[in-house]
Regions:
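Polybasic, glycine- and aromatic-enriched phosphate-binding surface used to engage nucleic acids
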Residues: 1, 307, 311, 318-321, ...
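Generic, well-ordered alpha-helical scaffold segments in large soluble proteins
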Residues: 102, 106, 110, 144-152, ...
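Charged, often flexible domain-edge or linker segments that flank or initiate folded functional domains
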Residues: 1-84, 123, 127, 131-255, ...
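Class I S-adenosyl-L-methionine
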Residues: 79-148, 529, 557-564, 572
Length: 618
C-alpha cells in the first residue's frame, strides 16, 4: 500500500466519524455555520484518535507477521490488548515502519476541518508543528550527526550508552543501532530514546523491533524501559511524582550524568503566551510551562529572556551527559548569535569543548516543510573550547576561541560567515564602537505607538509623526497624515528635550526583514518630526551626522550588522556595537552617485581591499 492510499483511507475514516457531528434529531434541520464551527472544535480529537488507531493496526500487522508472541509485544510495548481491524493489507511488512513514519509526519503537517461544500477534511498546515515544536530531521542528516558524534566517544562503541533525546519517530535511533554488531544487544542494552508524543514513540519502538528477530516477555519490558514516554525537561520530586515527568530510576538510572553520547533535534518552540494565536487554553498552558522552567531550580543557562524549548533541551542534555561524553545537536543558528542565548552559549564555549559547528542557511532544506537557518554542533562535555571547526557551505576552517573572545568579548557570538570575512572582523576589532562616542545618542523613537495614542491626531500640528513604514530610500515618505499634539513634548525626558527635540536626526526602521540584502538604511528626518517607536534614531551635531550618514549607509556597516543580527529587529544595543572609524578622517561633504562609489570611499577608510569590499557588497 502506498502512503497516499493510506492517507486517503485515514481521511475517509475521519470524515465518516466527523460527519456524525452534523447530524441532529431533526433530519431537516439546516446545517448552520455555528453547527460547523462546533463540529470543528471536536474534529481534531477525532482525527487524532483515528490516526492513533491506524498506526496501531499497522504495528499489529508488522508484529503479528514477525513475532510468535504478538500478544505480549502489543500489550507491553504498545499498551493495547486488541485491535479492531479496518481491513488494511500490506504486501511487504518491511515497509510498515516507514509507512507509519510518513503517515505521522503527514498528520503533523495537517489541519482537519469540516465544510458543507466538500468531503475533504485535511489541509496542509504547520499549526501542529508550531504548537509541538516538532520538526523531524531528514535521515541522512541524522546519520551525519551520529557519525560525527561517535568520532570521539569516551568508551568503545559496544559499551556506550547512547540517548536519542526528543526522539520523535526515531530518525537518530535508527542510525545509531547499526553501529552495534549485535543489534539486539544495542536495542536492549546500549541505546535509549525519550519523547512525549505517544504515536511518534510507538514508531520508534516499532523501528527498534525491526532490528531484532525475537523478543521475550521480559525483553519487552526492557525495551519499554529504554524507549520511554516521558517529558525529559521535567524532573519528578519525591513528594508529588507526575507520571510523565522523568524520575531518577528512568532510563536505567542514567538520566543524571550517565550517557556517553546524546544526539538530538530538540523541539523548537518559543514559549510566548499569546491568546490571539494559541487561544486561552493554549496560552495558559504555555504560561504554566514558563513558570515551571523559571522556578523549578533545574535550569541556570536557558531561562533568560523569552524561553525556547531548544535551549532548555540543550541544557537538560548536558545534565544527562557524562563528563567527557559527546553531544551532537541540530538546532536554530540563533544559538550562536542571538543575545537571548548568550548565557547558554557562554556555558557551552567556556565550560565545555565545542568541537565543530556547521552552519546552514535558511534556503537549505534540512527539514521537511520548514525553512530555518540552522546549525549542527558537536560538543564534548567538560573542559574548555580551543579550536572550533567551522563549516559554512563549502568553506571549512578553524576559529580559535581566543579570537571569538577578542572580537565579541561580551556575548561570544560566532557569526555565520566565511573564513575571509573573519579577516575583515579582525580589522574592525581595533575601532571604537558607536556607544563609545559620548556626543552621539542612539535611541528608540520617542512616541510609543500603543501607550501614547492619545497624543496622535490627524489634525495638522507643528509636529509630524514618523512611523517606520515612512522611511524610504532617501527621504521620509509622507504617507500617513498623522501629527503629534504639542502637549506630548513636556511628557518626555529633559535629555530628549535638550539633545533630540527640534533637531534633525538620522533615522532607520526598527523592523527590517532578516532576509534582506540591505538591513541598515539611514535617512534624515526633519527637525520638527516626532518619531514613533517603530523607528530608531541617532542624534548629534550636524557635521557628525553627515559623516555618520555616509558610514551607516555603507556596505561594510550593513554587513557588520547582519552577521550578528539573528532576528528581524534593529535593536539599539546592536547599533551600539557597530565599529566607527575616526570621524576626523571622514569628509562630511563627500558626494557619491552609486553605492559602489560610497563603498570604495568608506571601505578605504576602514582599510578594506578591493576584494574585501566586493565580498561584503550589498
Amino acid at each position: 500500500m502506498e502512503i497516499k492510499t493510506l492517507i486517503s483511507l485515514e481521511d475517509k475514516y475521519i470524515y465518516q466519524d466527523a460527519i456524525e457531528l452534523l447530524n441532529s434529531d431533526d433530519p431537516f434541520a439546516p446545517i448552520t455555520s455555528e453547527v460547523i464551527e462546533n463540529a470543528n472544535v471536536k474534529i481534531r480529537e477525532i482525527a487524532a484518535r483515528i490516526h492513533h488507531h491506524i498506526l496501531l493496526e499497522l504495528i499489529y500487522i508488522y508484529v503479528s507477521n514477525k513475532f510468535s508472541n504478538c500478544t505480549d509485544i502489543m500489550q507491553i510495548c504498545f499498551n493495547t490488548n486488541s485491535i479492531c481491524p479496518t481491513g488494511l493489507y500490506i504486501s511487504n511488512i518491511d515497509t510498515i515502519p516507514s509507512l507509519c513514519e510518513h503517515l505521522h509526519i503527514s498528520f503533523l503537517n495537517s489541519k482537519f476541518s469540516l465544510s458543507i461544500k466538500s468531503s475533504k477534511v485535511r489541509s496542509k498546515s504547520k499549526e501542529q508543528l508550531i504548537e509541538l515544536g516538532a520538526v523531524y530531521t531528514q535521515s541522512h542528516i541524522a546519520k551525519n550527526i551520529v557519525d560525527d558524534t561517535f568520532a570521539n566517544l569516551p568508551v568503545p562503541i559496544q559499551e556506550a550508552k547512547v540517548l536519542d533525546f526528543a526522539c520523535g519517530t526515531g530518525r537518530f535511533y535508527e542510525n545509531v543501532i547499526p553501529y552495534f554488531e549485535d543489534k539486539k544487544k544495542g536495542v536492549l542494552f546500549n541505546v535509549y530514546a525519550i519523547d512525549l508524543d505517544l504515536d511518534a514513540l510507538n514508531i520508534t519502538r516499532l523501528k527498534a523491533l525491526s532490528f531484532i528477530d525475537s523478543l521475550s516477555k521480559e525483553e519487552c519490558f526492557t525495551l519499554c524501559q529504554h524507549i520511554v514516554l516521558k517529558d525529559a525537561l521535567r524532573k519528578n520530586n519525591s513528594f508529588f511524582p507526575e507520571p510523565l515527568h522523568i524520575s531518577p530510576t528512568d532510563l536505567d538510572g542514567l538520566a543524571e550524568g550517565g550517557f556517553d553520547a546524546i544526539v538530538s533535534n530538540p523541539p523548537y518552540l518559543v514559549l510566548k503566551p499569546n491568546k490571539s494565536k494559541a487561544g486561552v487554553g493554549g496560552s495558559d498552558k504555555i504560561q504554566e510551562q514558563v513558570n515551571y522552567y523559571r522556578t523549578c531550580g533545574f535550569y541556570q543557562y536557558s531561562i533568560e529572556g523569552m524561553l525556547n524549548l531548544y535551549q532548555l533541551s540543550i541544557e537538560r542534555m548536558l545534565q544527562m551527559l557524562k563528563i567527557g561524553g559527546e553531544l551532537g545537536i541540530i538546532c536554530p543558528s540563533t544559538l550562536f548569535g542571538d543575545v537571548s542565548a548568550k548565557k547558554l552559549r557562554k556555558h557551552l564555549l567556556l565550560r565545555n569543548n565545542v568541537r565543530s559547528i556547521r552552519f546552514f542557511a535558511e534556503k537549505i532544506p534540512l527539514f521537511e516543510n520548514v525553512n530555518q537557518a540552522t546549525n549542527i554542533f558537536i560538543l564534548q562535555k567538560g573542559g574548555s573550547t580551543s579550536d572550533i571547526t567551522i563549516s559554512e557551505e563549502e568553506d571549512v576552517f578553524d576559529v580559535n576561541i581566543s579570537l571569538v573572545k577578542e572580537l565579541f568579548p561580551e556575548n561570544l557570538e560566532i557569526p555565520t560567515i566565511k573564513s575571509s570575512e573573519w579577516d575583515i572582523l579582525r580589522k574592525l576589532s581595533t575601532l571604537k564602537k558607536l556607544k563609545q562616542f559620548p556626543s552621539i545618542r542612539n535611541r528608540r523613537g520617542e512616541l510609543d505607538l500603543s501607550l501614547c495614542r492619545e497624543f496622535v491626531t490627524s489634525a495638522p500640528t507643528p509636529y509630524r509623526l514618523v512611523r517606520g513604514n515612512m522611511i524610504g530610500e532617501s527621504e521620509v515618505k509622507d504617507i500617513n497624515g498623522e501629527f503629534v499634539l504639542e502637549s506630548f513634548i513636556p511628557t518626555r525626558s529633559k535629555d530628549y528635550r535638550t539633545y533630540d527635540f527640534n533637531r534633525k536626526r538620522l533615522i532607520c526602521q526598527q523592523i527590517s526583514n532578516g532576509g534582506l540584502r540591505r538591513r541598515l538604511r539611514f535617512i534624515f528626518c526633519a527637525s520638527t518630526d516626532v518619531l514613533g517607536n517603530s523607528c530608531n534614531y541617532i542624534s548629534s551635531d550636524e557635521e557628525t551626522l553627515a559623516k555618520l550618514y555616509l558610514i551607516l549607509n555603507s556596505s561594510i556597516l550593513n554587513w557588520r550588522f547582519k552577521i550578528t543580527s539573528s532576528n528581524n529587529h534593529i535593536n539599539n544595543y546592536e547599533l551600539d556595537e557597530l565599529p566607527i572609524i575616526d570621524l576626523d578622517k571622514v569628509d562630511a561633504t563627500f558626494s557619491y552617485s552609486s553605492q559602489e562609489e560610497l563603498d570604495e570611499y568608506i571601505g578605504s577608510l576602514y582599510g578594506l581591499s578591493k576584494d574585501e569590499r566586493k565580498l561584503i557588497a550589498i
